[in-house]
């Protein structure tokens, strides 16, 4: 008999349930976590032994959404789920980031976490549920893991923080922040905001961390009852003698190498030193393990850099702690793109373009939470040449998707409303050089490219990456970190925003003991850096250009009577297709009668507007039109008037004498003047050639084909 072990408690406005012992009993651990009908099944499997020669921690997190969770069948050809969507990839990263630092440094056994969404309440996003599930499953598994963690989403509505807001509440919120951490420390923050202050953002982080303590308490309670025995795993003993010998051979030389400011030259020197040390030690003792020597070298290298920073010495490239690298900002660098910019910060460089399209170019997203249309696209590309390497070039990797989403969050709050700027906008950031903070360079480049394209963004946006080095009570916050400082530091966080406030914040903390005060110092230092970068950017371009590129489609908007939409579209889309071909424009019609005509040529747009106005014009009884014969039948002829509308000329109305055969008087395609006699309740039009050609008749209205 299967007996589940359950913890059920109130979490904000929702009831959270964590259940184990019922399913997937061959996995190392498994839990079902539900929050008001949104349920995620999370499993963990860990290998008891590490693979020989394993040099990194092989943790894999897979988050997958099943359409049956929302009572739907996949719309793909094979009617089953395929490769992960962008949303699934981002959630996988969201789960991975706070749990990865909680495994011991020397633990190299393979661990896989799989989170499957099996039931969905559209008001409750499954990402928080999945994060809690991963924490619970790892804590139950017995695998070496310094958790559990809690997770919370924080909104900001009417100047109040809201815990785990619903989907509807998030639409009204000026903040969407996810925070995860242990009982004593914040580990991860991911957020987008509608221009909030540093204090408001920090308050949200602290609020979310305080509220999630109930989750941690209940996971600990569940582990006490149902947790598996802790693995008998011991960290490998440190070879103190070897460590001292490596430090003696390498420490001073590595210190000298880290005075080289140019990245590639420094890397070459560091690699040469490491190779020399390995060769020297192996020459003395062939039985030594090369990978062990390399691990110790990495530790010595890390200590060299961190010690310099903590002593207040200049950083790797000679800067002080709060200095920004040299900036070079250019706009309009590509002649045919709608907007472009080249943003360079030290050895990090982004070529960013902005392209304008119509509503037809928007991305339709069929997500589990519901369908939506995205008219602002942001794509980030990180080719191998940007770091002087060779490698595969193809579809975007998880990192590129994550960095693109972060950069998009930084700019999103500044984008104009669709009714003010009815274009689909695509921004692409090509990272051409990288030495730290390429995602924030993408934010700066995007702001410049959008202004260059004439997109009326509300304000310029800049981004900056910050780092932290901390030993006991001594800490140093670094502005505009290099790649090495990111790798060797204890925290990296990225802040994007305008002069008025923050639009995006991403924080990853690798150690405990980061207090509110430290985060406050870091955020304030980031503000100074952001304002400095904005000042340089504004020298290149301070406001959006007054007009869009001559190569961009111009969208003209008119309104028609919604009852006339069917006339413009025609049977099976025949009229609108003909209009598009005839005028060389793109025409989009909304249900409320809004018509958008897009064309790169202004005259073509005017022609399309005139044709639509002709089609939608009301037919006036008694008025004479120039028409074209479209069909001939025994009892008369059908004549097209007023841009696609047809009326019947009865055989008795063709001439002022008896007509035996219609074709004796009329031919297909013949142009004839006709007078409107009547429009009945069903919209049928009765016409007369006889009365239109009578001596007292006036001149016909212009022809509308």
Swiss-Prot record:
Residues 553-612 form the KH domain. The gene is pnp. It is found in: Cytoplasm. Involved in mRNA degradation. Catalyzes the phosphorolysis of single-stranded polyribonucleotides processively in the 3'- to 5'-direction. This is Polyribonucleotide nucleotidyltransferase. Residues 622-690 form the S1 motif domain. Mg(2+) binds at residues 486, 492. Belongs to the polyribonucleotide nucleotidyltransferase family. SUPFAM superfamilies: Eukaryotic type KH-domain (KH-domain type I) (SSF54791), Nucleic acid-binding proteins (SSF50249), Ribonuclease PH domain 2-like (SSF55666), Ribosomal protein S5 domain 2-like (SSF54211). One of its GO terms (biological process) is mRNA catabolic process. It catalyses: RNA(n+1) + phosphate = RNA(n) + a ribonucleoside 5'-diphosphate. GO terms for molecular function: 3'-5'-RNA exonuclease activity; magnesium ion binding; polyribonucleotide nucleotidyltransferase activity; RNA binding. HAMAP family: PNPase. Its EC number is 2.7.7.8. Coiled coil: none annotated. It comes from the Bacteria. Its cofactor is Mg(2+). Keywords: Cytoplasm, Magnesium, Metal-binding, Nucleotidyltransferase, RNA-binding, Transferase. InterPro entries: ExoRNase_PH_dom1, ExoRNase_PH_dom2, ExoRNase_PH_dom2_sf, KH_dom, KH_dom_type_1, KH_dom_type_1_sf, NA-bd_OB-fold, PNPase. Pfam families: KH_1, PNPase, RNase_PH, RNase_PH_C, S1. One of its GO terms (cellular component) is cytosol. The keyword Amino-acid biosynthesis does not apply. Disulfide bonds: none annotated. The lineage of its organism: Bacteria, Pseudomonadati, Pseudomonadota, Gammaproteobacteria, Enterobacterales. Component of the RNA degradosome, which is a multiprotein complex involved in RNA processing and mRNA degradation.
